């Protein structure tokens, strides 16, 4: 039988040993590529947390704050230089039930360890996050959430009226005075908050894009609850030797296959992002459909769960289109309601459907009378980071 991987030989339907070996190489390589795409959300969130930890924001009350805005020294998949970001992360395995006491005036949300939306934190209040399987007492006075994972990433931002140093400093100070993060066990006497500045710091929050990705995912899987991944995705990683409670020691053959698989997975992700198949499963990607415009939505069809029109069919390409270049999941980022909502338009190609070239000059034409209540920004990102 002639195929794209060569000639496959059978006798009475039984494959030859050489054919079986060839097929297994194909199976393992394709599974490695798919594992890269399926594991990307978890790897990306873990990398965000590890980036903050590298600056010293390790304990619950140690929180990274971009007190003088973000700049290109810090490697983030997304972010802008117009808002003051503060990004607590919670470790419910280490700390048990944990409280985020949020003030008024912040916008943001909490995501679990696989970048699934948990809740918005747009209103002042005490948000209590319980570990998976928690059966202890739950005190009154909290808004309670039970994420599927031990790790929870919280992203909050405050928008200063302008970017003058005084106004930005005031916004950062209001965050310092209002936001508290602590273990529920310390609720009677929470430790003083420690603010770690992320501004002008060179550190990385982007997940691995080489074969180290699989070792990183093994570390995440070993630490996390089973709810991190679906049974099917857990099985996918197990087929590569990555399974909770077991060592991951790929032999030379598998090392070569993983290196090949992650390279193919990267190529898949970049192809999906730059050239979405809008005539097929990415038909809802365009901001201006039927116009030939290159502007696309961050969330295909403004669906932050990527679960299709019926709410039950996962669009894996739509999920890759978001998680490969972006971070932070909340319905509020795909709700263009005038006066209260927000929306994002992304262009990976110019008006002629060609990749942007840093040696050329481009012009953006904005729609007339676009509704802007809080702020708007145009942000340029590096195609590699």
Where are these regions (language model features)?
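A compositional/structural signature for long, glycine/proline-rich flexible linkers
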Residues: 1-385
